[in-house]
Swiss-Prot record:
Highest rank taxon of the organism: Archaea
InterPro entries, A to Z: Rubredoxin-like_dom, RUBY_RBDX
Occurrences of domain Rubredoxin-like (ranges): 1-46
Listed name of the protein: Uncharacterized protein MJ0737
Molecular function (Gene Ontology), one example: iron ion binding
């Protein structure tokens, strides 16, 4: 199952597809697929490198 990161609050969660609203902040956001697809993170869970690289609103403040 894919992992997603909210563009607003940075929340990372597992779901078949991104929801309409973030389960953490409740906002309508863009969701980035941060699933692990490489050997470095074992092809499972989320990729910490992708989580660190994807922007979110809170990191811009």
């Amino acid at each position: 199952m894919p992992w997603w990161k909210c563009s607003n609050c940075g929340y990372v969660f597992e779901a078949e597809k991104p929801p309409e609203r973030c389960p953490n902040c409740g906002e309508k956001c863009t969701f980035y697929d941060v699933s692990c697809y490489t050997p470095e993170c074992g092809f499972k869970g989320y990729d910490p490198k992708l989580v660190a690289r994807t922007p979110n609103q809170e990191s811009k403040m």
